[in-house]
Amino acid sequence: MVDRRTLLLRIVQAFSATGALFLAYPFVKAWLPTFNQQHTLEVDLSDLKIGEIKQVSWLGRNVMIVRRTPEEISGLAEDKHELKDASSVHSRQPALAANQYRSLRPDVFVVYSNCTHLGCEVSASGTAASFNCPCHLSEFDAAGRVYKSAVAPVNLEVPDYQFMSRKILLLVKRA
């Protein structure tokens, strides 16, 4: 038989454990990854014509997908002396973008549309041959590489992605 003192002790322990669980729940929930948030996005490129830009929202950020013209592709090899980081050594990008095009395919360029200075939304300047930041007038070439005269410290950030087919692009968030 359990005496009164032991019974009260067990009741207090049970209430304390229950309270600790209720207190810990919000912290544990915040630390666990959100399973309802989609970490991949499939983008159809069949309607993207040469010289056009498609903008999609993914994981709370805007992503620009540019279909480059042959002139823009050939122009990427020129004027490297005007760029801060022409080889993209100091840029945030996956290994797939470690080339002069900063993309898997020379004709399709995928980039976050946030300036690397203060995060303003960059826009294409008439054509996709260059990007401009409206906040501090930083300029980027067709591969998102920043010019030396710009305020932005590094090139535009390239997300991780892969091609599922010639016309389907999959944006992927890797851990």
Residues of each region from the PLM?
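N-terminal secretory signal peptides and thylakoid transit peptides that target proteins
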Residues: 1-15
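N-terminal pre-ligand scaffold of iron-sulfur
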Residues: 9, 25-114, 120-126, 155-175
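Helical transmembrane-bundle signal
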Residues: 16-26
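Short cysteine-rich clusters marking metal-coordination/redox-active sites
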Residues: 115, 133
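Short cysteine/histidine-rich zinc-coordinating motifs and their immediately flanking basic loops
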Residues: 125-130, 144-148
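Detector for the c-type heme attachment site
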Residues: 136-138
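Low-complexity, intrinsically disordered Gly/Pro/Thr-rich segments
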Residues: 143-161
